[in-house]
Amino acid sequence: PALYGLIFTVGAGAALAGALSAAKIGARIGQGNTVIAALLLSAVASFGFPIAAMIGDESALPIVIAAGSLIGFSSLVFNITQVSARQALCPEHLLGRMNASIRFFVWGVMPISALLAGAFATWFGLAPVLFVGAIGAVLACWFIFASPLRGMKNIVAEGR
C-alpha cells in the first residue's frame, strides 16, 4: 500500500507541475507544438508500464514512477492547452454542446476500453496488452502531428 501512495503522490506532483507550467511552455514553443509534444510525451511514456509489467517485481518501481509522472505532467499540459483553445474558438452559445460532446466521446469509451483491456490481458497477458496500448497511443499521435496544429504559435489567433 505504501508503494501505491508513493506512485500516486509523485505522479500528482508531476501533474501539478504540468498545470503550473502549461502556459509558459505554450508561450515558449507555441500552443500547437505544446499540444503535439505533450501528447507524444504521454504516448512514449506509456511504454514504461509494459516494461515494468515484464520486470514484474518492486525493482520496476522507478519505471512506474517515471512513466506515471511523465504522463501526469504531459496530460495536464495537453489538457490545459487544448481545452483553453477549444473554449476560446467555440462560439459561446455552443460551448455546452461542444464540451458535452467531447466528454461523451472521450469519457464514454473509457469503460468499454477498460473492460476490453481487462479481458485481453486475461487472455494474452498484461505486458503484451500494455504494449499494444502504448503502440496505439503513439500511432494516434500521427493524426494530430499531421494536423494544422504543428507550428501554430497561438491556436486561437490562427484558428479563426
Where do the PLM segments sit?
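C-terminal transmembrane bundle of multi-pass solute transporters/carriers
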Residues: 1-160
